[in-house]
Amino acid sequence: MKTQLTHDEKIQFYDDGYFVVKGAVAPDLVEAALTRMKSARKGEFLGPDQAMTDLVNASSVTPIMQELMGPFDPPVTCQTGILKKTEPGEHFNNLGYRDKDMPYYGAQVHMDGSITIAAPQEVQQGTEQEIYDRYFASGPKGGLGRSPEVMGNNMVPMFEDPEMTLGLGSFTAFVFVCLSDQSIEGRGQTCLLKGAHHAVERFFQKQRDINNCLGPEGPGWPRLDYAAPNRCGLVYLPEEVRNQFIDETSEATPDGRKWPRPTQVLMEPGDACIATYHTPHSGTRNELGTESRKNIIFRLRHKKRQPNIQVNGVSDHPDRGQMGEWLAFEEGNDPWERSKFAMCNQWHEWDGMQEVVAQMRSRAN
């Protein structure tokens, strides 16, 4: 059983922002999870089921992550990412484009921790401010204006902090555990913008240096794209980051906008993809699969960021409660400034990467 990455594998992880561990989860754990999924009642949420959480807690993923990252709370729940086979659709996606028009099997490459409300399915009318107000008033809490109390349909707050200086939730690492054959593109696999974690870190640092407002609605990152076909698309990645990954392989939507080509992560049941929080990613349309795409997604945070707060394994905004509740922190503990520090220093929470990070940075200099 593999219990850690080799030095060369860590270099690859540093360069790419992700690494696929083949056979990280034993066949019996894979089978137990699949069996539990088959027996699920319609609408049953399987996230807290032991058959799901064991994919990390009882597999080699735990020792690998403990060595690579450091101590973390064992997940008590997870995201069950199941995508049925579908054809390209007419509906507007969260970026404000029709699903059928998005390249790369409908990829909507994004950073986690960002509020998402159901995309308007009609072209929006009015001024930009009117569109903004109407969109955020359509969320589950109604019209609260621009406020950290505003919640998305994904139960992520508009802002993490009361002062509205942090527009993204954050954590340390993703683990995507594969339970279906995703060895061929077009089967709904997770895709990642390879190497973009470095650009994202630099962008956060730039925002910090300008006015210490990080994420959407900070410098250089508007919340909404009013030029999208429905006039109300979410800006999931700032243009400054996106444009660094436009090249001759980039495909365009009908309006001529080019989109960075993400890497489709090809995996087989039992494989696990480890990725940094900073790595932009997306699910894709399961257009060519022979079965539903099944990825079980975990979000882990190094314990040193908040030793007294338990992270449940699924939340992308653990400085707030799962449903956006305000958490209690001891005096002198500013959780949002701690998270900003981690966002601007992406390797701070990767204990097992320090030697490689020092080596790679010395080469760059």
Regions found by a protein language model. Name each.
Residues 278-282:
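Short, charged beta-turn/beta-strand-edge "cap" motif at the junction between a beta-strand
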Residues 5, 105, 121, 307-310, ...:
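Ligand-binding pocket scaffold of soluble enzyme catalytic domains
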Residues 2-16, 25-269, 285-291, 298, ...:
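Non-heme Fe(II) oxygenase catalytic core, chiefly the N-lobe of the double-stranded beta-helix
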Residues 214, 302-340:
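Double-stranded beta-helix
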Residues 329-365:
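Intrinsic low-complexity, glycine/proline- and repeat-rich
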Residues 263, 287, 291-292, 323, ...:
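Catalytic-pocket segment enriched in acidic/His residues
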Residues 268-271, 276-277:
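Catalytic cores of PAPS-dependent sulfotransferases
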